[in-house]
Amino acid sequence: MDINSIINPKHTSPEAIKAWRDKFDNAVPYRHIVIENFFNEDVADKLYNNFPQIDTLNVKRKSLNENKSEDYHFDRWDPIFSEVREVIKSEEWCNIMTQLTGIDGLKTTMDALGSGVHQGQNGSYVDVHVDVNMNPQANLWRRINLLVYLNKNWQPEYGGDLEVWDKGMKKMYNKVSPTFNRALIFYTDDNSPHGYNKINVPEGESRKSFYTYFYTELGKDFKYRDSKFISRPDDSKARKLATTTKETLKIKGKQFLKALGIRSLDFQDKNK
């Protein structure tokens, strides 16, 4: 399938890619870009009109630090989702992602850590965090996140902006509103904290996005890092303590399980 049948052609020309690369490299506090009208209009409309109902998404992430649903079983959804995934995982698009980011050998996978959808109802949030940097089943190094928001008529008072923080959590450098057909591409490592505050949306509304994570081979510089939630400066002392305690216990617990040879605790297929 021609990538320009899915991705807006104005973003795939050599001139456009060079311009995005310049913006990506010069973004602070870490490399990221925001692209408007990412998909062709008809594609974005089809994704929006056929977005799966939240009660059909079988992975529910609800804890002190997050409240959202997700899924990646494309065979259960309208064919447009599979068509989009096929283009985004294509060699042609992965080569564009390499040109755009400067990271050689980017590719994605067909599992939960490849592509899928996120959705949150009223009250949904994901506290600021850094991502796990490995797909353990594919044995690949996670390098780039691509999020495309699919929320028509999103209002500022709904909240849900994706916050871009510096590593030390001293300053929030950017807020990306999850408006319709807006893409966010960013480098993911321990220097890239991000998350969104609790949303306040009317009944029937939700915060929706299509995600793809891009990888490279592990390489000699790879060092495993788990996902980790990080307190905001204005969090209460009690919440900061609770987050720190929970994350410390989680990481130590996973280290223990890893020593026992259990590597995929967080990556099991919860949809079967």
Task: Please place each PLM-identified region on the residue numbering.
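Non-heme Fe(II)/2-oxoglutarate
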Residues: 12-15, 21-101
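A structural signal for well-ordered alpha-helical scaffolds and beta->alpha junctions
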Residues: 40, 44, 77, 81, ...
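Non-heme Fe(II) oxygenase catalytic core, chiefly the N-lobe of the double-stranded beta-helix
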Residues: 49-52, 76, 85-142, 151, ...
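Catalytic core of Fe(II)/2-oxoglutarate
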Residues: 134-142, 152-272
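Histidine-centered active-site/metal-ligand motif
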Residues: 32, 129, 194
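Eukaryotic charged/polar low-complexity linker/IDR segments
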Residues: 145-147
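A structural signal for short, well-ordered beta-strand segments and their strand-loop junctions
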Residues: 34, 58, 107-110, 116, ...
